[in-house]
Regions:
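Non-transmembrane elongated oligomeric "stalk/shaft" segments that connect baseplates/barrels to distal
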Residues: 1-195, 215
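Viral virion structural and adsorption modules
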Residues: 1-9, 685, 695-700, 706-722
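Beta-strand-rich, repetitive solenoid scaffolds
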Residues: 85, 115, 124-127, 224, ...
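Extracellular beta-strand-rich solenoid/capping regions of secreted or surface-exposed proteins
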Residues: 110-118, 180-188, 200-216, 224-252, ...
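Extracellular beta-strand solenoid repeats
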Residues: 124, 194, 202, 208, ...
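Short glycine/acidic-rich loop motifs that flank beta-strands on beta-rich extracellular proteins
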Residues: 204-205, 225-231, 260-265, 272, ...
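All-beta strand scaffolds that present successive hydrophobic residues in beta-strands
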Residues: 215-218, 246-253, 282-286, 305-310, ...
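Gly/Ser/Thr/Ala-enriched C-terminal appendages of enzymes
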Residues: 413-499, 503-512, 523
Length: 722
């Protein structure tokens, strides 16, 4: 039974008080509580409580560092707030054990572990090493305080770690709740905004991104436009408020933007998923996917530095649609399905969709388009208020409904000026859903106002590997008037219908055409050719090309139709296997004469080298030959018109034939051209090798003067009628 003390004044000599106080002395000494209660019901501090107060006082006054002393040198600790450096770990330690028996003596060359241990009631670390260890732990980030919405000075941890999430604003993902207004404050604040928690976030409004915003849409996150909202999901502040250009905006991550187009009714700019205009530096991508946009997934305009890497589409119209001015663009890895063009560059547009400003597309580098399905992979078109300058498009794969790359005119886009364009590494198959289309099409389609509808200074097409067996690989057309000043096609497909075609008379011109480096198997079709020309080609250069034709009924190196024009052609290292003719002019006379220069040319089989219909052709040959033929068809044939030969052709058969008043002759000089001289129109001073043994001059080297052919070995002569 507990002893009941008296209320006698102090000092009391009552045995009851004596016994009670004995218990209180034990409580004072041994209790871990901070206080005990005396017989008058008053509280006093225990030894533990006194220690606590002393510790708080020492903390308030700070620690006393024993300068020059360490565990290595040894030291004497006289007070609880004195600390000693352990050089082994760079940590300061204080002694929390008893000082009842005097100071704590630390021998030289000791450690905290060897002089009492590290634990409460012994040595404990009080320096920054403990803090560093705690912060370095996986849970260390939880030790750093952060206030959402607070502005931290640059260079501080708070500044570096600051970002915002919907959850910080009380917003959770939901497939039913519309939370657009709930995040207005978050987007107004800008900075780093992170949709990290997977789920659907439904907005009924456009979220406006301020300058400096870095928006992260994480994996499993879908930002969806509510039914009937009829607005873009994202705009930037400059565009939304017609204000100064935004410095930097980023939209990144592998989440999804769902325009929900099946449940929107608007047309025009409201049908875009995102509109971003007036930005110095814009970065979009990271695997982000746009679905269900009724018009462009991304409409981007007036950007100085555009970076678009890793865009994914499943949408009804264009994927990434760019309008000028855009001064530097780095575009990589676009993929998916687009109802129209996956990547479009338009200077101007239809009125409902046009936010462009006068200016150029310059320094544009696009690579890696993977078309699961696209109407076209890339489209380039303009209205004359700017130019396309220094463009490279590379690496297009998959399937396109129509052409892979298209440069063309339209009702509102009547003048396209391209300064420098490179298109390379094209593997996508055009015309995948039906009618065959060219891999690359340049076509003004009859739209224009003045001058040229399409004018291209330099076009380089390299590594064109698209397999197309029913249409020209590169198709040049238009009835208004278009020109390509310099076109190079380097690296040709293995199989083809035709490589390049100029498909309209009088309205199309190519100043300089070069086609090179390929070993092609052509379809057995009358229009199969390396070049098909109905218009004007000033210089036609074909180099290092092997042409494999199925038969001698079809196929040609150059198919020249009616009144087309070719001023000069240079063919170097060209191999023709079978085929109908190398140079094949049909229908009616060409406009003007042509120089055809053949170097290291081989015609293998019964196909002809050149035939004209009512036209004038000069053929200069160097190291040329015709092999594996029977002479059933002559190498050269003039159906009306005239062919002038010079140089060297190795063959064992007569090389010339004519009808309909056609003329074949040589230039003056000695030529290694085997032929029947009775078929060769005489030109004074010309020398060839006669193969017609029935002529009075006999076979062999002959020279003509005033229509008299003289055998240079026998002296025998033959007088020609032509």
């Amino acid at each position: 039974m507990a002893t009941q003390p008296t209320n006698l004044p102090v000092p009391s000599e009552s045995p009851f008080d004596f016994k009670f106080n004995a218990g209180k002395i034990d409580e004072f000494v041994t209790s871990m509580g901070w206080t005990y209660t005396d017989r008058f019901d008053q509280k006093h501090y225990t030894i533990e409580g006194i220690n606590y107060l002393a510790q708080q006082a020492m903390n308030a006054f700070g620690y006393v560092i024993l300068t020059g002393k360490t565990f290595t040198t040894g030291a004497t600790i006289n007070n609880p707030n004195e600390v000693l450096l352990n050089t082994a770990d760079g940590e300061y330690y204080k002694w929390t054990g008893s000082f009842a028996s005097g100071p704590k003596v630390v021998p030289a060359n000791s450690t905290p572990a060897s002089t009492g241990g590290i634990a409460p009631g012994a040595w404990i670390g009080v320096g920054d090493a403990s803090l560093r260890a705690a912060l370095a732990a996986t849970s260390g980030a939880g030790l750093v305080g952060l206030s959402v919405g607070s502005v931290y000075p640059a260079g501080t941890v708070g500044s570096a770690l600051q970002y915002r999430t919907p959850q910080m604003y009380g917003i959770e993902p939901s497939t039913t709740n519309i939370i657009g207004s709930g995040l207005d404050a978050m987007f107004a604040a800008g900075g780093d905004i992170r949709f990290e928690k997977p789920g659907t976030y439904i907005t009924d409004r456009t979220w406006v991104l301020r300058s400096g915003t870095r928006l992260w849409i994480g994996p499993g996150v879908t930002i969806k436009l509510a039914n009937g909202s009829n607005v873009p999901v994202f705009n930037n502040y400059s565009y939304a408020n017609s204000s100064a250009v935004d410095a930097y905006i980023e939209i990144w991550g592998s989440g999804t933007i769902d325009y929900n187009g099946a449940n929107q009714t608007v047309v025009g700019l409201g049908s875009m998923a995102s509109i971003l205009k007036g930005i110095t530096s814009l970065k979009i991508g990271g695997g982000i996917k746009v679905i269900g946009a009724n018009k462009y997934a991304w409409l981007v305009c007036n950007v100085t530095y555009l970076t678009a890497v890793g865009l994914n589409f499943d949408t009804n119209s264009d994927g990434l649609h760019c309008q000028p001015p855009i001064r530097h663009a780095y575009i990589r890895n676009l993929k998916g399905k687009t109802g129209d063009d996956m990547l479009a560059f338009t200077i101007g547009d239809y009125a409902n969709y046009n936010i462009s400003e006068p200016g150029d597309f310059s320094d544009v580098d696009a690579e890696g388009l993977f078309c699961n399905y696209a109407h076209c992979a890339v489209k380039i078109t303009g209205d004359g208020t700017g130019n396309f300058v220094r463009f490279r498009i590379s690496g297009i794969y998959g399937d396109t409904e129509q052409c892979v790359v298209r440069v063309w005119g339209d009702a509102n886009l009547t003048k396209t000026v391209v300064k420098n364009l490179t298109i390379e590494n094209i593997f996508a198959k055009p015309g995948s859903t039906g009618s065959e289309f060219a891999a690359i099409e340049i076509n003004d389609r009859g739209f224009g106002t003045s001058g040229y509808s399409i004018e291209v200074d330099t076009l380089l097409i390299r590594n064109l590997r698209s397999q197309n067996d029913a249409q020209q690989s590169v198709y040049f057309a238009g009835t208004f008037g278009s020109v390509i000043h310099d076109l190079v096609i380097d690296g040709l497909p293995r199989s083809a219908f035709a490589i390049f075609g100029v498909n309209n008379a009088s309205t199309l011109a190519v100043d300089n055409l070069t086609i090179k480096n390929g070993n092609i198997i052509f379809q057995d079709n009358a229009n199969s050719a390396v070049v098909v020309n109905r218009g004007t080609i000033t210089n036609m250069n074909i180099e290092n090309v092997a042409c494999n034709f199925v038969s001698t009924n079809n196929g040609q190196i150059a198919r020249l139709i009616a009144g087309c024009t070719v001023t000069r052609a240079n063919w170097v290292n060209v191999y023709q296997l079978r085929g109908q003719r190398g140079w094949n002019h049909i229908t009616s006379a060409m406009t003007g004469g042509t120089e055809l220069n053949l170097t290291n040319y081989t015609c293998d089989g019964e196909g002809r080298i050149a035939q004209v219909t009512g036209s004038t052709l000069s053929v200069r040959m160097s190291n040329c030959r015709r092999i594996n033929d029977t002479g059933a068809q002559t190498a050269f044939f003039a159906s009306g018109g005239a062919i002038t030969l010079s140089g060297s052709l190795e063959t064992g058969f007569n090389t010339i034939g004519t009808n309909s008043g056609g003329v074949i002759k040589t230039t003056p000089g000695v030529h290694n051209i085997p032929c029947n001289v009775d078929l060769l129109t005489s030109v004074d001073g010309a020398s060839v090798h006669n193969l017609n043994t029935s002529l009075s001059c006999g076979a062999g080297r002959v020279l003509v003067q005033t229509k008299v052919w003289k055998n240079l070995f026998s002296g025998a002569t033959y007088t020609s009628s032509i």
